[in-house]
């Protein structure tokens, strides 16, 4: 039997605006993030459109998933963590959150070695205070065949 995916948690003043699979975003550039597998994170030109609002995600190349949050205050030096299945340490980086501005925390399956089924947890902390925690259940790529980030196929 599968373990129940934990419900999303949002701290005081944090709204989880969207959770799920989103349209492949336009990448504006990258930002160094040495404590991640790739060593950088992608920066988006604008918040993407979420098309499948769910926490079950198929492990397929090109699929984008994550969350869009809005905070009621500016928060500097937020520690962002991604826990992948079987990892002893999370991938992490720091970012700033601006009051009232939607902030994307996402992941795109770009490489075969990233296609890891199991629970993927996205968290953020302001010091020791948890801002959010959202767990996605990544399923084998053969499952949920209709779920895609290619929005051209959906129009």
Predicted regions and their residues:
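Contiguous segments within soluble domain cores/interaction surfaces
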Residues: 4-119, 123-126, 130-135, 139-155
């Amino acid at each position: 039997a599968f373990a129940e995916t934990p419900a999303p948690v949002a701290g005081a003043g944090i709204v989880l605006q969207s959770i799920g699979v989103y349209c492949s975003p336009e990448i504006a550039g990258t930002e160094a993030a040495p404590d991640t597998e790739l060593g950088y994170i992608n920066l988006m030109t604008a918040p993407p459109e979420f098309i499948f609002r769910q926490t079950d995600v198929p492990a397929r190349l090109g699929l984008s998933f994550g969350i869009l949050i809005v905070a009621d205050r500016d928060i500097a030096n937020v520690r962002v963590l991604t826990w992948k299945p079987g990892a002893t340490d999370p991938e992490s980086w720091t970012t700033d959150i601006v009051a009232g501005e939607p902030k994307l925390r996402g992941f795109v399956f770009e490489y075969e070695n990233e296609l890891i089924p199991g629970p993927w947890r996205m968290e953020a902390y302001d010091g020791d205070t948890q801002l959010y925690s959202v767990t996605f259940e990544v399923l084998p790529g053969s499952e949920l065949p209709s779920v895609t980030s290619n929005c051209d196929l959906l129009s």
